Amino acid sequence: MEEWVEKYRPKSLNDVAGHSKTKEALCYWIESFIRGNKQKPVLLFGPPGSGKTTMAHAIANDYNFDVIELNASDKRNKDVISQVVGTAATSKSLTGKRTLIVLDEVDGLSGNDDRGGVSEIIKVLKNAENPVILTANDVYKPALSSLRNSVTMVDAGSVHTNSIPPVLRKIALKEGFEIDEKVIKLISSHAGGDLRAAINDLQALLTGGSIEIEDAKNLPDRDSEKSIFDAIRIIMKTTHYDIATSATVDLKEELGTVSEWISENLPKEYLKYGDLAKGYDYLSKSDVFLGRVYRRQYFGLWRYASALMTAGTALSKEDKYRGFTRYSPPTVFTKLSRTKVAREKLKEILKKIGIKTHTSIKGARSTLDFLYVIFESNLQMATDLTLYYEFTKEEVEFLTNKKISKDIFSIIECEKTKKTDDKNLMKKDLEEDTFKEKTNEIMPVIPKRPKISDNQISEILTKDNNPKDDVKKASKKPESTSKKQATLDKFF
């Protein structure tokens, strides 16, 4: 699969997004050269992905020039520049056309393999008969101080954020995709003026067939990705030890991450089985040293891991592979991005299990297999465990499926309703008992009237019918009183 950056690279300056002033300056420069007015070479500078190399090739195509290019993956010492650039700068091409020489990333000249490169470039430029365009990311590096006086500096600058969405939209439509405008804006703003990076992001995200807004939000850090793409390209293309090892010097990535990138892209670059086998062999040896670094905390082994990973991989190929290769982020990163929500949910479940079982998250994982079986086979026990671990409906659904989750929470809801009804009934009974007790405290107790039998009733009636007996009793009372009085008188 061809890399979209190369597939849709503009063939004409008119197709280059933005850079209106830069394009005008380049056209004026090369037209003056064609008219016979010799011009200084142009040093086109700007951040990575701003289109410097693209504009150099586009202007050559517009004005029918052949191109000879030396980039960061090539050896660019004094002898090479003298032989390749020096010859091309003063002669016509085999086709009879004029030649445009492109020296890409001259600010990357470093190491033993590039020794004397800058001084030789200055020497060649003085005698050049053909136009020369140099590109650089950081034109103010001390190593380029002498070169700046020999060239005309043209600022490419970064691509304006508003110029990126139309390009992405056009590429997506040509590839048969319709993308939400919000996603395109997210990718564009994330690129930070780096059109190449934006196109790489678009292609990486569309590898899965579609893009969601969350995928665009979870794009990796732009600076790191920009550096890693450049580093991988250098490692894969070069056959020189120093160039390969220097590719990761300023890289803001761990070696483990670089290893994943190389592993992902090695089969795309190395088409010969022997080269591929050697490359993976060196990569595995690098991984062994990385493991020793982490286990023993001996970081002196780090340089061996780095050398095996970069130079080992680069020198595994018999010959340099020409042409463009589509490099992409490791699929493991894409999968991790897409499973982020699921992993967070699983982590929350394991936390709840760990709290109840007094184990770590790692230890709680061992209970998951049992939970899966229980939730699938025993609904009542699954309900009890859900209540015990305080799982939410979404968490139970994550462990099982929607149907089981629905059944479990239906049971829980029924039990809650039953408990509520029982509680209300008990409350009602308690209120009634309390009311009776309070009523008894307020009202006095009325003694019950004794029951009267039929015989007692007849006796009462008989007494009422014989008044003589009452008279006799009444007449007897004074006698007893007088006797008592007489008795008392004796004491006085």
From Swiss-Prot:
Pfam families with a match to the protein in the record: AAA, RCF1-5-like_lid
Keyword Endoplasmic reticulum listed: no
Residues reported to bind ATP: 46-53
GO biological process, one term: DNA replication
Subunit details: Heteromultimer composed of small subunits (RfcS) and large subunits (RfcL).
Family designation: Belongs to the activator 1 small subunits family. RfcL subfamily.
Descriptive protein name: Replication factor C large subunit
Protein's organism: Methanococcus vannielii (strain ATCC 35089 / DSM 1224 / JCM 13029 / OCM 148 / SB)
